[in-house]
C-alpha cells in the first residue's frame, strides 16, 4: 500500500432539517406491518462459495508468530463472502510468493508446502486469486559490485523506502536482470497453472517500491517482457498492470508508450487512499483528493490508449480509509468503505480493500486490518466494525450489475441542513435474477463518533420493479419494511438520509440459504495410536461436522481429500486412529446444516 478511486447520479441536494435515524423507526403501512415477520431482521450473510463475481480483499499469507493459521481470521474471508483476494505482500515487505523467496539460490525455484496449502485453501473455498509477482532479488538486482549466490529473505518488518545495498526494491533494469525476473515469472505461472489465473507486475511501481523512485520507462520495459512471459506460459492466464499508487496519467502513458504491449494487458489496476493520513471521504477520489488527477480521468486515458483491449477490466485493488488517521475513527471507516466500494462498482470497477488482518511485526502496527492483529490483547483477531460493513456489502451487491435505467431523481429538499450542498449519490443495480437493489447516501465528510445529523426525505425510484420495498442499513445490517406511498408504486414518503449507505430492495431479495460459518483454529497433535484434532465452531447453526483427511505420497500434498468422519454439529474434537503408518497426513474440517456446507477450516499436517 502507498506511503501516501465511477460514475452515477451525483447531484447537489438541500436537506430537510431533522434528527431522525433508521433506528428510530419509520411509519409503516398495514402491508409493511404484516410483512415484517417474514423478513430477516439483518442482512443474511453470503459465503464465498455462493458468489461468482464480487469484491476483493488484500491479505498477508499466514506467518508465525504474528499471523498464525491456527487463529480465527483466515476463514473469515470465506464467511464474509469475499470473492477475490490479492496476495503477494506481507504488510509492506515481500511474501513467500515473491522472487526473493522463490529463488533463494541461483536457478533453483521452490514454493513451500505451507504456501501450497494456503493457495489451495483459497481456491477450494471459492475465492479467486491474483498474485503480485515482485520485487527484486539481491542475487541479480542489487547495485553492489559483488553479488551473492544465495540469499535469505528478510523478516516482514522491512518496508519501503529502502535503498540499502541488498534491498529487494532494486528492480530489474538490465536485459540480464529482466531475463532473470521473467524466468521467475514463468516458473510461478507454470507452477500455479489451473489454480491462479491473474498475475500482477509489481506493486506501486510509481513510488518507493521501485528504487530509487518510480520510473515509467523502466517499468514499461519490464512490462514488455512480463506480458509474453505470462501469456505464453499459460494462455488462460491474465496480465494485470500492477497497482499504481497514484492516479497519475503521465506515468501510465509513458509506461505504455515504452512497453508497446497494450493489447496484452487484461486488467489495469490502481490504488486509492484519498487524503492518505487524514479523514477525506472516498468520493473525493474523483473530485480533488489528487488535485488535477483522478481515477476517473486515469481510466479514460487507458480506455483511449491505442491497442488497449475494449474489454479491459479496471480494479481499485487497494482501498481503505482507516480510523487511526487524523480526524477519523472506526465509525467513519465503517461508513466510508461501503461508499467507496459501491461508488466504484457503479463505474464498473472492482474494489479490493486493504487489509484483512494486520501482521503487527510490519511497519504499520494494527492500523489497517479489518480484523485486529496480534497485540497480546483480549481483542486480538476480532473484527472491527468495518468488517461487518464489508460482509453486508458483499452479500447485497456481489454479482449485481449497474442498471442505468433505474432512476432516482434528486429529492426536492429544503435549505436548512448543515450539510447543504453535499452531493446525493444513488445507484440502481440488478441481481442475476433481475431483482433490483438501490443504494443511496449523502457523500458527506463523516465525523468521528457517528455524529452526522440524520434526516428524512421523500424518494422516487423509477423503473425498479420493486413491489414490496424494504430498507437496509449497510453498516448495521438492519432491515426494516417500507410501503410505497398510497396510490403509487415508486414513491416513498419518508426514508432516512445518512452519510452511510442505505439500500432499498424488494422483500424477496434475500433468496440465498445461510450456510454455517467455517470451523477455525484446527490443530493436530500426535496421540497414542493416531492423531488428535481440535477446532472451534462458530455461527450458522451447524448440525454436522465433516472431517477430511489427505494421505500424501512421496512428500506431495496433492492427493485427494476423503471424508473420514461425520460428527454432530457441536463436536469440536476427533481422534483419528486409522491413518496409515509412515505417511504424511493432512486434515481439514467443515460444518454443515440443512442449507449446505461451510468453507473448510485451515489445514493441519502430521507425519507418522
Where do the language-model regions lie?
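Aromatic-lined carbohydrate-recognition surfaces of secreted/lumenal glycan-active proteins
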Residues: 199-201, 223-252, 304-322, 349-361, ...
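Pro/Thr/Ser/Gly-rich low-complexity, intrinsically disordered linker/stalk tracts
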Residues: 512-542, 581, 596-608
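Aromatic/acidic polysaccharide-binding cleft in carbohydrate-active enzymes
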Residues: 323-418
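Beta-strand-rich modules
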Residues: 576-596
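Glycoside hydrolase catalytic-domain groove-lining segments
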Residues: 273-326, 350-359, 379-383
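C-terminal beta-strand-rich structural cap/linker in extracellular carbohydrate-active enzymes
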Residues: 483-515
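Substrate-binding cleft and catalytic face of glycoside hydrolase catalytic domains
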Residues: 80-283
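Carbohydrate-binding surface patches
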Residues: 412-465
Amino acid at each position: 500500500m502507498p506511503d501516501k478511486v465511477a460514475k452515477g447520479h451525483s447531484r447537489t441536494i438541500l436537506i430537510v432539517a431533522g434528527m431522525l435515524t433508521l433506528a428510530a423507526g419509520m411509519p409503516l403501512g398495514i402491508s409493511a406491518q404484516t410483512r415484517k415477520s417474514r423478513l430477516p431482521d439483518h442482512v443474511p450473510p453470503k459465503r464465498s462459495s455462493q458468489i461468482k463475481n464480487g469484491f476483493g480483499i488484500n491479505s498477508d499469507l499466514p506467518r508465525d508468530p504474528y499471523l498464525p493459521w491456527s487463529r480465527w481470521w483466515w476463514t473469515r474471508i470465506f464467511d464474509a463472502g469475499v470473492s477475490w483476494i490479492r496476495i503477494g505482500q506481507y504488510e509492506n515487505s515481500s511474501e513467500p510468493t515473491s522472487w526473493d523467496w522463490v529463488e533463494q539460490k541461483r536457478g533453483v525455484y521452490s514454493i513451500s508446502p505451507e504456501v501450497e496449502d494456503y493457495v489451495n485453501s483459497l481456491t477450494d473455498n471459492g475465492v479467486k486469486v491474483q498474485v503480485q509477482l515482485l520485487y527484486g532479488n539481491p542475487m541479480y538486482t542489487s547495485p553492489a559490485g559483488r553479488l551473492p549466490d544465495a540469499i535469505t529473505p528478510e523478516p516482514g518488518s522491512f518496508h519501503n523506502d529502502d535503498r540499502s545495498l541488498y534491498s529487494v526494491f532494486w528492480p530489474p533494469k538490465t536485459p540480464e536482470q529482466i531475463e532473470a525476473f521473467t524466468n521467475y515469472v514463468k516458473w510461478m505461472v507454470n507452477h500455479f497453472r489451473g489454480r491462479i489465473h491473474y498475475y500482477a507486475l509489481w506493486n506501486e511501481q510509481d513510488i518507493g517500491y521501485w528504487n530509487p523512485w518510480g520510473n515509467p520507462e523502466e517499468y514499461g520495459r519490464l512490462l514488455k517482457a512480463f506480458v509474453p512471459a505470462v501469456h505464453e506460459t499459460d494462455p488462460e492466464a491474465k496480465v494485470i498492470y500492477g497497482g499504481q499508487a497514484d492516479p497519475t496519467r503521465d506515468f501510465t502513458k509513458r509506461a505504455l508508450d515504452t512497453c508497446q504491449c497494450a493489447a496484452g494487458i487484461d486488467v489495469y489496476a490502481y490504488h486509492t487512499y484519498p487524503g492518505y493520513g487524514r479523514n477525506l471521504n472516498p468520493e473525493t477520489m474523483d473530485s480533488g483528493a489528487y488535485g488535477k488527477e483522478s481515477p476517473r480521468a486515469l481510466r479514460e486515458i487507458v480506455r483511449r490508449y491505442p491497442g488497449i483491449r475494449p474489454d479491459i477490466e479496471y480494479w481499485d485493488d487497494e482501498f481503505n480509509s482507516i480510523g487511526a488517521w487524523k480526524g477519523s475513527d472506526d465509525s467513519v471507516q465503517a461508513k466510508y468503505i461501503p461508499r467507496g466500494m459501491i461508488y466504484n462498482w457503479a463505474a464498473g470497477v472492482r474494489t479490493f480493500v486493504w487489509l484483512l488482518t494486520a501482521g503487527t511485526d510490519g511497519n504499520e502496527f494494527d492500523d489497517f486490518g479489518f480484523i485486529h492483529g496480534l497485540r497480546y490483547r483480549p481483542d486480538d483477531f476480532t473484527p472491527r466494525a468495518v468488517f461487518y460493513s464489508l460482509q453486508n456489502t458483499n452479500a447485497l451487491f456481489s454479482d449485481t450489475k449497474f442498471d442505468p435505467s433505474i432512476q432516482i431523481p434528486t429529492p426536492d429538499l429544503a435549505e436548512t441542513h448543515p450539510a447543504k450542498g453535499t452531493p446525493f449519490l444513488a445507484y440502481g443495480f440488478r441481481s442475476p435474477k433481475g431483482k433490483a437493489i438501490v443504494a443511496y447516501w449523502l457523500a458527506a465528510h463523516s465525523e468521528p463518533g457517528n455524529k452526522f445529523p440524520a434526516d428524512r426525505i421523500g424518494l422516487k425510484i423509477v423503473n425498479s420493479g420493486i413491489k414490496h420495498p424494504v430498507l437496509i442499513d449497510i453498516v448495521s445490517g438492519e432491515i426494516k419494511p417500507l410501503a410505497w406511498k398510497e396510490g403509487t408504486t415508486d414513491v416513498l414518503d419518508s426514508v432516512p438520509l445518512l452519510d452511510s449507505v442505505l439500500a432499498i430492495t424488494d422483500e424477496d431479495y434475500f433468496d440465498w440459504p445461510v450456510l454455517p460459518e467455517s470451523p477455525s483454529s484446527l490443530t493436530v497433535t500426535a496421540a497414542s495410536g493416531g492423531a488428535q484434532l481440535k477446532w472451534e465452531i462458530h455461527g450458522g447453526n451447524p448440525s454436522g461436522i465433516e472431517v477430511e483427511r489427505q494421505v500424501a505420497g512421496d512428500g506431495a500434498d496433492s492427493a485427494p481429500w476423503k471424508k473420514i468422519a461425520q460428527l454432530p454439529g457441536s463436536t469440536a474434537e476427533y481422534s483419528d486412529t486409522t491413518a496409515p503408518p509412515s505417511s504424511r497426513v493432512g486434515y481439514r474440517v467443515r460444518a454443515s446444516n440443512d442449507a449446505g456446507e461451510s468453507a473448510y477450516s485451515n489445514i493441519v499436517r502430521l507425519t507418522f
